[in-house]
């Protein structure tokens, strides 16, 4: 294709939906090299819908050469039908923000663009020979001009796909800023944050130049277009007359890098020569081409990672543990780790020259890492070592897993979470101030009530005296009056004088009746507020003094008044206790846990008080406080492991001091109405936590739930009169592996996480007595055998969650999060089938290096959770936090094996707990030690 024709197509494409067409070479990244897929191809930017674009790459075949090839194969009696079926001639890629567009120099030295695909990176290199102009400078300028135009069009397409608006609405700066991070000459393989390793260049001695050329040319030629092999080899050989360069570091830089450390100690377990790299400016630069990596046993179950020179002088040492954030990369046969011990945290890398040595190091390091974390000798099989090593390998490919091809990525996913509603009334200081003000108002009201009573008594005495002097007027005043409830904020009323007319007296009586009605309404509202606040305050009506006609009832009235005074004193005592407890919880305790209901209410625990917040679309607002959470003996406790039930009508909770009991709170009262003993065959059963029988059970009236402790699990039916525990299983006699967390699917399948990092999957029929034998005479219950057990790399599982359909699991460890597909490509499920050697390998979610550095190298994730969805919906996000950072991963991208797409937001205070609102993926309730907010997308 001529240059004129190609340039013409840029401005007047043959199809209206094609924005640009270019010719060149097409590569994909494989084992650290660009492997040529198409020697000649055409790249087209195709628009198929509004704001939706595709990159289409098509192989160009020379028909004459193809016919000759077929004739030759027919003459040889070979069939090429199978070869044609397996031959891929076409690729297409959706243009989205996740494309990660890079501007690179291709393998042939021409202008190139690379982008991220589903499983690896792809590169398009412009063809410099497909040009009628013999001037090389003009060729290069033409290629660069066309390449920049292609890049500009791609940037505009990315802008439109992000904001669903024409790119003309955005300025050049907005478009450039949006694509700036992708416009770099550094390329990176998929699923890693590692940039292409670029080293400093030094001149080698002339005597070794020819050897280096022969070593470098052969492997690199295997990945170049076949028709240019001879020409490329000539260019390289001709350049041997001058100076030849390889990736290395100068001797001066190597010497300056060496630090004086303590001598190497311990038993040597592994030794291998490697090259050492240091990450600077998102690139790994070669620091020393010839160092030795050592793995030594320095103490029992303590191992040290050394980097030394040939003379055994250590230049680097670090204890092996999870704080290294270890990562293996098979394609680059390299190992990367994080060092937070220095003043400036940084990442290092070692690259092996022999694949066998790399595999040996990978297996050895995996075992040592497991033993350090568990503080126990590894006793697993060789298959378990390979499985654990694959978890630490970022680019490991599992053939049993099928990732999504539908991008499912839209502008909504790109919106960052922002704190749109920080209601100042939700801060504990303000809530406590409000509480104290309300107490002062109550005290002031009681003082006003006493003054009202005294004024009423004086007015009554005046009425009696006036009645003796004038019998006619006193007879009217002797009418029996109904008792009046105490006013809220009412000034004392003066009685009418003797000289007032009957009309004035009637008007005053009407006013009194109206005031009584208003007071009763105000008291009803106040009683409702007090009920919501969880405080039992008895409002006793106060009666006015009686006249002589009521003397016969004085004794009864005195008795009633005595009872009223007793009840009022009791209510005042209750109020006083509530005041003290609230003040204690608010001043001495911090927010400790959060649970979000599906009816737009959230519950935050602070000491023995539960704060109730309304969480609607407008924001979050404090509603009331449930105080004085007590046991049967009246002792207060701080609830743990809460769980909502029966459409947010009841709240289950555990007491850390009585671990064999479960408490049920009626949120309509609100008060603890039942305390259940978890007894199994007349033996108390400890309960570390509870989980619903089915996912989203809080939206139904199902009362059954699952409890667990250690390696035991049991089904609880609160409707049973005596034995609440109906079925129980125990997991054997291994006390070193205990259950730490659990989650259920919509069909009742159960996933458990353990302290050894294992994940155990149980069928939905686990507690079905018709399908499973539970008649064991063992007082601990029958043996629980999981359908599938996934080994861990040693880090305890601190949280676990499962999608409603049971196809995906998210497990949280301290420094990383694992996402595990529970279903294989053949439809097998880890919950229902015994997968054995086919068990899927987890994918680790690790923060980017720059974010880890922001945190000072300290990462401590809270239990990650999927967003809560209803029927016929699928989860879209994973939510967690560490320190003061709130993090949300895009789950749709994770299902495509793209693991580094997440949003991170920093707050001033540390995050205690966080949870999505029900059926919302854009609103998050965030709890801090002294505040509660709603963070949502714009």
From Swiss-Prot:
- What are the coiled-coil residue ranges? 56-89, 461-582
> A Pfam family name for this chain?
VID27
Q: Where is the composition biased (Basic and acidic residues)?
A: 66-76, 576-587
What do the Gene Ontology cellular component annotations say?
cytoplasm; nucleus
Q: Where is this region: Disordered?
A: 63-83, 434-587
Keywords, in A-Z order: Coiled coil
Question: Cross-referenced InterPro entries, in alphabetical order?
Answer: Vid27, VID27_C, Vid27_PH, WD40/YVTN_repeat-like_dom_sf, WD40_repeat_dom_sf
Q: What highest taxon heads this organism's lineage?
A: Eukaryota
Q: Does the keyword Coiled coil apply?
A: yes
Bias type Acidic residues, positions: 440-477, 494-531, 548-575
Q: Which family does it belong to?
A: Belongs to the VID27 family.
Name of this chain's protein: VID27-like protein
């Amino acid at each position: 294709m001529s240059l004129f024709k190609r340039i013409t197509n840029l401005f007047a494409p043959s199809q209206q939906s094609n924005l640009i067409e270019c010719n060149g070479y097409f590569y994909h990244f494989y084992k650290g090299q660009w492997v040529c897929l198409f020697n000649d191809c055409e790249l087209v930017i195709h628009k198929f819908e509004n704001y939706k674009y595709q990159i289409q790459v098509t192989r160009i075949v020379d028909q004459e050469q193809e016919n000759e090839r077929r004739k030759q194969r027919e003459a040889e009696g070979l069939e090429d039908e199978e070869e044609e079926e397996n031959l891929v001639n076409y690729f297409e890629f959706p243009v989205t923000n996740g494309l990660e567009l890079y501007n690179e120099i291709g393998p042939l030295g021409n202008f190139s663009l690379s982008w991220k695909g589903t499983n690896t990176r792809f590169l398009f290199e412009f063809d410099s020979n497909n040009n009628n102009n013999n001037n090389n400078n003009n060729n290069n300028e033409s290629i660069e001009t066309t390449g920049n135009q292609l890049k500009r069009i791609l940037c505009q397409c990315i802008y439109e796909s992000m904001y669903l608006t024409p790119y003309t609405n955005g300025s050049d700066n907005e478009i450039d800023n949006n694509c700036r991070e992708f416009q770099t000459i550094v390329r990176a393989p998929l699923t890693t944050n590692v940039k292409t390793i670029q080293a400093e260049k030094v001149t080698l001695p002339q005597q070794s130049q020819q050897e280096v050329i022969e070593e470098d040319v052969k492997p690199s030629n295997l990945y170049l277009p076949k028709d240019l092999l001879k020409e490329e080899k000539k260019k390289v050989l001709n350049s041997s007359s001058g100076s030849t360069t390889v990736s290395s570091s100068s001797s001066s830089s190597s010497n300056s890098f060496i630090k004086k450390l303590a001598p190497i100690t311990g038993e040597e377990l592994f030794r291998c020569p490697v090259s050492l790299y240091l990450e600077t400016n998102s690139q790994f630069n070669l620091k020393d081409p010839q160092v030795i990596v050592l793995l030594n046993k320095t103490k029992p179950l303590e191992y040290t990672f050394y980097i030394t020179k040939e003379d055994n002088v250590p230049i680097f040492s670090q204890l092996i543990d999870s704080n290294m954030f270890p990562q293996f990369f098979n394609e680059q046969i390299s190992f990367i780790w994080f060092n937070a011990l220095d003043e400036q945290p940084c990442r290092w890398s070692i690259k092996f020259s022999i694949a066998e040595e790399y595999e040996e190091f990978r297996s050895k390091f995996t075992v040592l890492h497991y033993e350090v974390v568990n503080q126990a000798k590894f006793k697993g099989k060789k298959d378990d070592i390979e499985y654990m090593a694959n978890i630490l390998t970022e680019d490991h490919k599992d053939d049993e897993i099928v990732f999504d091809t539908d991008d499912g990525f839209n502008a909504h996913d790109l919106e960052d979470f922002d704190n749109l509603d920080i209601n100042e009334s939700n801060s504990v200081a303000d809530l406590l101030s409000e509480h104290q003000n309300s107490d002062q108002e109550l005290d002031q009201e009681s003082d006003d009530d006493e003054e009202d009573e005294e004024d009423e008594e004086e007015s009554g005495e005046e009425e009696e005296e006036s009645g003796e002097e004038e019998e006619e007027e006193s007879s009217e005043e002797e009418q029996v009056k109904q008792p009046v409830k105490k006013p809220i904020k009412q000034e004392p009323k003066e009685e009418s004088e003797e000289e007032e007319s009957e009309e004035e007296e009637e008007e005053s009586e009407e006013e009194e009746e109206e005031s009584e009605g208003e007071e009763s309404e105000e008291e009803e509202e106040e009683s409702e507020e007090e009920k919501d606040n969880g405080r039992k305050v008895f409002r006793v009506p106060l009666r006015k003094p009686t006249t002589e006609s009521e003397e016969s009832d004085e004794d009864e009235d005195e008795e009633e008044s005595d009872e009223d005074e007793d009840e009022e004193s009791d209510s005042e005592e209750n109020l006083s206790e509530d005041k003290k407890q609230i003040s204690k919880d608010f001043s001495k305790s911090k927010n400790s846990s959060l649970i979000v209901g599906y009816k737009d209410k959230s519950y935050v625990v602070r000491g023995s008080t539960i704060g109730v917040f309304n969480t609607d679309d407008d924001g979050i607002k404090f509603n009331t406080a449930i105080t004085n959470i007590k046991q049967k003996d009246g002792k207060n406790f701080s609830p743990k492991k809460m769980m909502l039930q029966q459409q947010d009508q009841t709240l289950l909770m555990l007491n850390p001091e009585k671990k064999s009991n479960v408490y049920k709170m009626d949120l309509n009262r609100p008060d603890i109405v039942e305390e259940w003993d978890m007894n199994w065959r007349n033996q108390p059963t400890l309960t570390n936590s509870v989980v619903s029988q089915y996912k989203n059970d809080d939206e139904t009236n199902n009362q059954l739930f699952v409890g667990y402790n250690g390696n035991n699990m049991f089904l609880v039916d609160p409707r049973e009169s005596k034995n609440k525990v109906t079925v129980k299983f125990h997991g054997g006699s291994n006390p070193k592996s205990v259950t730490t967390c659990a989650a259920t699917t919509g069909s009742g399948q159960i996933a458990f996480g353990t302290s050894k990092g294992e994940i155990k999957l149980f069928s939905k029929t686990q507690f079905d007595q018709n399908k499973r034998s539970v008649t064991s005479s063992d007082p601990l219950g029958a043996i629980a055998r999981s359908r599938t057990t996934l080994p861990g790399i040693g880090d305890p599982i601190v949280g676990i969650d499962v999608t409603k359909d049971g196809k995906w699991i998210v497990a949280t460890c301290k420094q990383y999060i694992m996402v595990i597909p529970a279903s294989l490509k053949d439809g097998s499920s880890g919950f229902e089938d015994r997968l054995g050697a086919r068990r899927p390998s987890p994918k680790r979610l690790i923060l980017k290096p720059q974010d880890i550095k922001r945190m000072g190298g300290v990462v401590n994730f809270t239990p990650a959770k999927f967003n809560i969805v209803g029927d016929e919906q699928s989860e879209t996000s994973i939510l967690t936090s560490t320190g003061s950072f709130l993090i949300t991963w895009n789950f749709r991208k994770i299902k495509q094996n793209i693991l580094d797409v997440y949003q991170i937001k920093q707050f001033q205070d540390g995050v205690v707990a966080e949870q999505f609102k029900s059926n919302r993926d854009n609103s998050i309730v965030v709890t801090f030690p002294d505040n509660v907010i709603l963070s949502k997308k714009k």
